Amino acid sequence: MRAIGHFLPHLRGVKQGPEHPATLLDTLLSHQSDSARLKSAHAVRDHFTTADDEGKRAFLQLLASGYNTDGKLLDAAISHYRKQRDPLSLSMLHAASEPRRQTILRRLNELPGGTASIIDMRREALRLKQDIPDFAALDHCFVHLLASWFNPGFLELRQLDFQSSADLASKLIQYEAVHAIDSWQSLRSRLEPADRRCYAFFHPRLGDEPLIFLELALTLDIPDSIEDILRSDREVIDACDATTAVFYSISNCQQGLRGIPFGGLLIKRVVDLLRAECRSLKTFVTLSPIPGLARWLGETGGGAFQPMTDGQDNALIASASRQTLLSRAAQYLAATTPDHGDPVARFHLGNGASIERLNWMADLSVQGLRQSYGLMVNYRYDLDHIDYDHRAFAEGALPRMSSEVRLLAGLSRQQSGKRQQNG
């Protein structure tokens, strides 16, 4: 890691010109007219966006380490609060404890396109974080502000179809992170039929740039293969005849918003829409990958399962290990906690879902075989249990699971609600 001084040419004794980032940031923080402040914000943004990686690192480290809380102001606020101990002095103390970098970010947000610029700045910070010694302090400010600016009240839910703009459609192809869309015909098959839907969240400051999108299928039963969802020669059903909504792909679109939670809210909002539209819907499930399974097996003595990457032949060979692999997968998912385990499992279980079923050879793509030996899982959103299961999982209970999954994991009914101390 580079020495701190490498990033801080603004240290005492180094001459600062008008285009030096410290000069630009100090000017932005100073008392100015509205027009002068916007001009300063433009200068800061232009400096960052045109800088190379070395310049971006230096700027971000300067922002992280050089614009903390004003110590004198904080000491005065603490002293005042100790004397008064009233709501006003507490509010003043809170304001005084805020790092000056948050004021800088707020002023950058005042620019046209300012919110997008801050998202881009955080994306770059995440990319370069290994070379930003004080990244954690900086990212705390990014997350604090972005979580407020992107709270549910500001989010717009839209249904996307094949008549959506070509620009928006191309973004769906670009951002799809679970099951690649390899052609316009493939996109059409996901958006146009009566039993296929796609929904996305948008923010008024980002226009037609999606934050996250969710693809789903309306079916007559719970599917056990992604091929059943994606194949083009399937029989299309009327949406009002469907009994099951299957969420099979959810993709975050903005790297700079990583860690800002949208997915759980999107699923719940879509469930409400679907229930109002299709009274026949009774079951809400996912068909989800298990991206951490192969790695976990390799780390926990599962080396007997050889990596599979070339499709059906390996899938057939692996069938001899079917029961063992299903059991190990069930154990892996059952051990999920809010902070540990498969990332997709943490997401759905943290939103109140349960583990419904493991599906053998459900994804025979190269990625599906490599990361989970072709296994996929159905998580179930039982509307009568979501809130309870969300709280229980957050408080340390084992995930709720069907009797089939519980049996595969080797758990008794008595064990299913309680996490072992060593697990």
State what each model feature region is.
Residues 1-260, 264-423:
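Extended, composition-driven regions rather than compact fold-specific motifs
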